[in-house]
């Protein structure tokens, strides 16, 4: 029996329907402007041109000095890590899988105890409990941090005293206001991710850590999240972003920490 060859071609789905089909050559010839208008991500990965994170210091911001962390009491994932993030900066944390990016984020927000080293905020050393009060982490799997029975209720947990207008403004910006009564577990993966970003924005905590915040997002939603993170920095927040997304990194971040 002669085997049949299956040839797949890219298609563009809009509002749940296939609205356009491309040949491979047509798809590769799309200009950046056309691709962005369609909400598609880049096909190429440009090298990172951002400057490195600043060394540890005693001034304003978050300073990490000689940090050593292990996961589940195993051998240290990284040793004597030092860097700083100033208010108004967005620092990307990048590196191969397994080098400790998520471990670092969990340690900085007080979910994991360090083996050695010091974490300072505005020059003052922070213990684990103090870091839990000062930092908010949006996890890569946001299902572990959505607890309410509605989108609105989830935001209210993070900001119990916020005016309704403020919550509505944040949800509207992230294209979630029309889902305000929806159960978080009934949202799509990208919508859950944006809801977690909304709760971080509303938390008013000075240190915000995002673990792969653009995972699964198309170009338009990635730009929205990038804009929100830039706004947080302009408000004087200290922002770290764990990411493999080079397109997002170049749009949203000021410096990069390579692990």
PLM segments and residue spans:
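The feature captures the beta-strand-to-loop junction immediately N-terminal to the Walker
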Residues: 94-96
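Helix-to-loop junction immediately C-terminal to a conserved catalytic motif
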Residues: 109
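Conserved ABC transporter NBD signature motif
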Residues: 117-131
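Conserved ABC ATPase "signature" region
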Residues: 164-179
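Conserved ABC ATPase signature
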Residues: 183-187, 191
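Catalytic Walker B motif of ABC-type/P-loop ATPase nucleotide-binding domains
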Residues: 208-211
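ABC-family nucleotide-binding domains
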Residues: 218
